[in-house]
Amino acid sequence: MKSYLRLLWGIALLGCCACTTSQDRTTLLEVSPRSVVLPHEGGDEWIELQADGAWTSEVSPPIAREWLTTEPASGGAGKHRVRLHVAPNADFAQRDASVYFDAAELSQVVAVTQAPTLVTPGRLELPALNTTEYLTVGSASEPLEVTLSPQAEWCTAVVEGARMRIRVSTNLGAERSVTLHVTAGRFTQDVVLVQRAFDPARNYGDGEVVALQRATSGNGVCLVVVGDGYTLAEMARGTGKYETDMRRAAEAFFSVYPYSAYRSYFDVYMLTAISEEAGMSCVSPSETVDTKFSTLWQGVSTSISCDDGAVRDWLTRVT
């Protein structure tokens, strides 16, 4: 009889243990999304996790833990938001890793990809004068596409092999900026270009009138000295090429008789004129230069022509 009771008691205990084990078993582990792509500059992505038991996470391969972290790294039953954080990626190669979520015998994996750096630097400051600079282009598997936002006529961006040519025209106003949207397949990167403001304290602006001499005899005969084919880079006050050349031109004028004898009768003015490009156009050999007055040299002798109407209109700035 005692043996029979012991057998019944053992069966009851076994049933209780089996029941307890069944109730404690983890049967639910869900994560979403299963794959994420993060930008090269770094950032966060959130994973929605639901489990009915304790869970843990692990980043693989181990070297990826230098740039990828999870928070929290573990938890209990319930719904959780797990933050995936990636550090900036300065390399021209994409990063790939996996985050494994485990709960008892259940496992889920999230694939993590971080975009590569497409071009460097990510921000470029440019001078006020027209200039050309270059960005370094990475070895992306997809061809690069570039758009400007907002559209800016003063800026162009062209990919040339392993570099991107940036060209800006002269800025005579306030500081301005534009964003380059660079795309290579599914990866994107924004590059900010800032062109500095024109500094009137250090440079002459377009169409400024500067008195080089005042008449001390008579009513004053007006003489205006103006040049063509000078860019903003040559407009420094006092030391720039434009002012130096205009003063030399005035001195050359008064070095010839009879002007040398009557110099005191003249009011002499320098009128600034800023061109997009330096120099002048030429017929032979053929060369076109974008200048204020379209000055053209025939290529032989000293024959030079220009847009006379544009010059006359410009001279009206001197009153």
Regions found by a protein language model. Name each.
Residues 26-29, 52-83, 141-165:
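Surface-exposed binding patches on compact interaction domains or structured appendages
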Residues 17-37, 104-109:
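Bacterial Sec-dependent N-terminal signal peptides
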Residues 110-116, 191-197:
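Interdomain boundary/hinge segments at the C-termini of tandem beta-sandwich modules
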Residues 199-319:
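Zn2+-dependent metallopeptidase catalytic core
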Residues 36-42, 125-130:
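Short, solvent-exposed loop/linker segments at the N-terminal edge
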Residues 87-93, 169-174:
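Short, surface-exposed loop/turn segments at beta-strand-coil junctions that are enriched for proline
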Residues 1-17:
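Sec-dependent bacterial lipoprotein signal peptides
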Residues 93-105, 174-185:
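A short beta-strand micro-motif common to beta-rich folds, especially ectodomain repeats
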